[in-house]
Amino acid sequence: MIILPAIDLKEGKCVRLYQGDFKASKVVAEDPIEVALKFKENGAEYIHIVDLDGALTGQIKNLSIISSIIKTINIPVELGGGIRNLNTIDMLIDAGIERVILGTAALNNRGLVEKAVKKYDKKIAIGIDAKNEKVAINGWLNISSTNYIDFAKEMEKIGIRNIIFTDISKDGTLKGPNLNQLKKLNESVSCNIIASGGIKDIEDLKVIKEMDIYGAIVGKAIYSGNIDLNEAIKIINKESSR
């Protein structure tokens, strides 16, 4: 299982949200490039970045910082937030983004997903953010009537191979992930599932790994000191090699 440390960008700084509430954002680091470098030094093989300003406005807002991170760390980066059209996807892939995450756009525009997958294949991922099992869109401000499992199955048919799943009620809470919803999703599709939201300690990571989940995104637990990234990667890798 791969561990992806998270950088959420708001106005050029690293922040953390609580249950997806933008009003409850807290700055955890002033310099995202420094944070990314530290993640790399601690063994990260992949970094998860969200442009929160982009998620709200529908346009990438922190591209210069994101580009600097990519050039500085030289390890794969996946990016979500505000990616609504093929031109933006083209621009991000050209900028060096390894995997582009579509959320709102995927629910509102299935044709975009089809075109993007046809052009970029596994470089396109889907972010499913759910509240009470319904898919949330527009920076988590609106809850659709679409069930998260149904949406995942539809995306799999289009050709999506990677799904990032977040239970919004768990995000930023350090209360543990929604294991029940994760299990159901992992059993419903053959895509790689990346768990996100609520992961609080190494024990959560061990449980997720035992569920045969492909990856786990860790944010607040690293910034708060609950999880030592270097130690977590070593432990999970050690268990993988058994």
Swiss-Prot record:
Its main location: cytoplasm. Keywords: Amino-acid biosynthesis, Cytoplasm, Histidine biosynthesis, Isomerase. It is found in: Cytoplasm. Pathway: Amino-acid biosynthesis; L-histidine biosynthesis; L-histidine from 5-phospho-alpha-D-ribose 1-diphosphate: step 4/9. Coiled coil: none annotated. It catalyses: 1-(5-phospho-beta-D-ribosyl)-5-[(5-phospho-beta-D-ribosylamino)methylideneamino]imidazole-4-carboxamide = 5-[(5-phospho-1-deoxy-D-ribulos-1-ylimino)methylamino]-1-(5-phospho-beta-D-ribosyl)imidazole-4-carboxamide. It comes from the Bacteria. The keyword Isomerase applies. SUPFAM superfamilies: Ribulose-phoshate binding barrel. One of its GO terms (molecular function) is 1-(5-phosphoribosyl)-5-[(5-phosphoribosylamino)methylideneamino]imidazole-4-carboxamide isomerase activity. The active site is at 8 (proton acceptor), 129 (proton donor). Its EC number is 5.3.1.16. Belongs to the HisA/HisF family. This is 1-(5-phosphoribosyl)-5-[(5-phosphoribosylamino)methylideneamino] imidazole-4-carboxamide isomerase. The lineage of its organism: Bacteria, Bacillati, Bacillota, Clostridia, Eubacteriales. The gene is hisA.
